[in-house]
């Protein structure tokens, strides 16, 4: 392998996480959300691992992601929801994809695509229950619902789902989840009364799946939990019965002595306090390492944690290993993993970079190889 770093993804952990989510979901089916290249873990391998563990649906934001799954031979029911006017929806229908409809223009384009392709479109109507993002609010949703049911009667679409998204299910103190659930149930009732052919009603994200049984309905849509990360700030993956699937590591390229008072990296924001060993890790912000993790991002070399010394550069950063370090070029530096071997976790990095675990794993760039182990795509 030519690149001196890699993200090792344990597909066995993915399967175990899906099994855990199925257990929590009870009678509800599981849609594994694999958007954003499966949160940076690899779209097709993670999708296959999730399906093999019992997920019955896949979900992706972008139409291109859904078409990539189909091109790879993944034929499970797949919902895609984020597209702009003029998107190739006829191609999506010919690929046997389910489409979200969140606005009147989207319904018009889906109906047009159904006529063009000769395929009856499977539609999931989105209602905004309080997220304030995609979908229409309930007091405006009736017109879209009526138009969709007319298109269904004309044989152009089939309204197979109603869905929405939770805004604060990760906050145990918020009453918004209960209110969103109430609004969603009313939207479902209206759709059923109007004659929609509903197969699935779905609201729960990872936090809803794990903490709010009332949000489960027919189908849950976990994403970050599939890759083993906690959606909560106050509950760890281990406490939830999940295993983080990604381990980010790199070989040290330089280990050298440095005197006390040596400035490190651009701007010399870090200066050695004593004679020490400095090590270069060949990952930088071009690979998705947060630049603002300089001085804070934790890395394990051997059994010892160090923090990034100074600024993160485009392709590399520096560690101050300390005066007694016994490290050499080629030794493995672990940025994060499951924590089972004492290494930092994505949650540690999220705290260091003042962000969330979702961003830490999803932002990893395409030049970092994904190495899949423990499954069909290993």
UniProtKB/Swiss-Prot annotation:
Enzyme class label: isomerase
SMART domains linked: Ala_racemase_C (SM01005)
Active-site residues, record numbering mapped to chain: 35 (proton acceptor), 266 (proton acceptor)
Pathway entry: Amino-acid biosynthesis; D-alanine biosynthesis; D-alanine from L-alanine: step 1/1
Entry annotated with the keyword Electron transport: no
InterPro entries: Ala_racemase, Ala_racemase/Decarboxylase_C, Ala_racemase_C, Ala_racemase_N, Ala_racemase_pyridoxalP-BS, PLP-binding_barrel
Statement: the UniProt record of this protein carries the keyword Isomerase: yes
Protein name from the UniProt record: Alanine racemase
Organism encoding this protein: Beutenbergia cavernae (strain ATCC BAA-8 / DSM 12333 / CCUG 43141 / JCM 11478 / NBRC 16432 / NCIMB 13614 / HKI 0122)
């Amino acid at each position: 392998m030519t690149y001196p770093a890699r993200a090792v993804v344990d597909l066995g952990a993915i399967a175990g996480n899906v099994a855990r989510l199925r257990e929590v979901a009870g009678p509800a089916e599981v849609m594994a959300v694999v958007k954003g290249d499966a949160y940076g873990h690899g779209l097709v391998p993670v999708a296959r691992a999730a399906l093999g563990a019992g997920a019955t649906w896949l979900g992706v934001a972008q139409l291109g992601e859904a078409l990539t799954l189909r091109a790879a031979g993944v034929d499970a029911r797949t919902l895609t929801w984020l597209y702009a006017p003029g998107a190739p929806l006829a191609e999506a229908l010919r690929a046997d994809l389910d489409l979200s409809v969140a606005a009147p223009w989207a319904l018009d384009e889906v109906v047009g695509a159904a006529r063009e392709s000769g395929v009856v479109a499977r539609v999931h109507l989105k209602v905004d229950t309080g997220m304030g993002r995609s979908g229409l609010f309930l007091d405006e949703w009736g017109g879209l619902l009526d138009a969709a049911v007319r298109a269904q009667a004309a044989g152009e679409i089939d309204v197979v789902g109603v869905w929405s998204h939770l805004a604060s299910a990760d906050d145990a103190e918020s009453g918004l989840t209960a209110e969103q659930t109430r609004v969603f149930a009313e939207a479902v009732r209206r759709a059923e009364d109007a004659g929609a052919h509903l197969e699935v009603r779905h609201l729960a994200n990872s936090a809803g799946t794990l903490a709010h049984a009332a949000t489960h309905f027919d189908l849950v849509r976990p994403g970050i939990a599939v890759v083993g990360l906690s959606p909560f700030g106050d509950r760890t993956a281990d406490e939830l019965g999940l295993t983080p699937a990604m381990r980010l590591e790199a070989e040290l390229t330089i280990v050298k002595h440095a005197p006390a008072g040596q400035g490190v990296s651009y701007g010399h924001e870090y200066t050695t306090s004593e004679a020490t060993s400095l090590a270069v890790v060949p990952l930088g912000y071009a690979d998705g390492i947060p630049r603002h993790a300089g001085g804070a991002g934790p890395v394990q070399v051997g059994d010892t944690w160090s923090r990034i010394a100074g600024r993160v550069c485009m392709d590399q950063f520096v560690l101050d290993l300390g005066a007694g370090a016994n490290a050499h070029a080629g030794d493995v530096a672990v940025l994060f993993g499951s924590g089972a071997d004492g290494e930092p976790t994505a949650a540690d990095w999220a705290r260091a970079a003042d962000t969330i675990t979702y961003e830490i794993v999803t932002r990893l760039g395409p030049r970092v190889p994904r190495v899949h182990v423990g499954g069909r795509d290993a």
